[in-house]
Amino acid sequence: MRVHAAHLLVPVPSTPRRHATLRFTVSAAATSVNVNQADAARKQAVIVGGGLAGLAAATHLASLSVPFTLLEASDRVGGRVATDEVDGYLLDRGFQIFLTAYPECQRLLDFQALRLQPFFPGALVYLGAGESGSPFHMLSDPFRFPIRSLSSVFSPVGTLPDKLLVGITRLRAAATPDDVNLSSPETTTARHLEKLGFSPSIVERFLRPLLAGIFFDTALDTSSRLFELVFKRLVLGDNALPEAGIGAIAAQLADRLPAGSVRLNARAASIDPSSGVTLDTGEAVSGELGVIVAVEQPEAEKLLPQLPARPKSKKPAERSTVCLYFSADRAATNVAPSYAPAGKVLVSVSLVGSFAEREDGELAGEVVRELGGWFGAGEVASWAHLRTYRIGFAQPDQMPPTEPAGRDPRVGDGVYVCGDHVRRRDGVWEEGGRGPGQGWGAVPILELRNLASVREDFH
């Protein structure tokens, strides 16, 4: 087992704890199958799935005054973007970060209201005790913290040419338009880093662990195009966590939707372009203006048999992660004060893979033992295991070759698909709020305007 990232989310004693109340404008449950006549007569679109993709699609439809009903199978919106409160700690369901540089996020979200807590633009790299005596070595962004980054020049994490190459790659990424990046020759990220000229030292000590934690892919088989997209976002913005947890992103989107437009505990069983959506209860929900399927890839393939089949040579890649949370008394870093009660520390540990053969308690014990070698046995002795989250489908298949023309979001007459597994026909991955490569995936705005035009025909 290899721990790829340990994050200490720590309270600042002088900062009072503020609990944000997450309010949703949603129906408490799909309680009634007897839709009143006025609702039955209303022409509407139907969105299947209340994750970020579905919420983003709903937000766009609302902005165009297109009536819709969003159907969410669970008892809450947000999908994988959720936060649980346990004994005063805020536990995101899987360690997630918010990248502020995504244009779609900037258009849809109120950053100030989220009270974002940014990460320092750098990393402490664990190499074990060496000649310097310290097991950790700092790498920081020289363009944001030039003085502090001087120590990075002399760190054993890569060679001096490697560090110069990081700076060159940073400048190039910031200046290159997305359409140029995403139409470039495609290979794996591992091969791409080699072609760029990075040494095995910096790849194995820094880039592979970093990118494996982002893509949940230790082999770095992820598309080089996606690497360029994500690296650019890392360069141009902050990594941050909302004060009330990552679930506050979904809460903010849901709170802006029209009252009664979201139905919870409403699971879609089938989709018929001519009649709309049938729930597992047998209720039919009409979708005269179209149906937008905004669920993760495996579920989308069940609901939409007409989706293009994957190439037989390309098996779905597992993109699983396990996130373990511990409470502690002392801190090594200070990232998100609001995630822990006063005087306590929240430790988040991310593992790449499913570890299905290990029970939660066994896995937590292994993690504590390994990190005892990082921070010292005395430091981790006070850690108490809070909860383990196993995310089986954390990201979709992102290995090359990706679809050269992208997938048309229209998969049938009046039926659209969106989500983090969809790439638009212009070659652009839809951008994300959960983290790199995991995003809104909303239907392109042109298609939504077409729905608005259709709506006018019904009036």
What are these regions (language model features)?
Residues 1-23:
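N-terminal chloroplast transit peptides
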Residues 3-7, 28, 402-459:
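C-terminal lid/capping helical subdomain adjacent to the catalytic/cofactor pocket in oxidative enzymes
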Residues 37-70:
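N-terminal Rossmann-like FAD-binding beta1-loop-alpha1 element of flavoenzymes
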Residues 62-86:
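Glycine-rich FAD pyrophosphate-binding loop
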Residues 63, 288-290, 295-402, 429:
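C-terminal segments that line or cap access tunnels to active or ligand-binding sites in enzymes
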Residues 84-107:
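N-terminal glycine-rich dinucleotide-binding loop that anchors FAD/FMN and/or NAD(P) in oxidoreductases
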Residues 102-106, 110-224, 231-236:
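Mobile amphipathic helical/loop "lid" adjacent to a hydrophobic cofactor/ligand pocket
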Residues 228-290:
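Helical element adjacent to the flavin cofactor pocket in flavoenzyme catalytic cores
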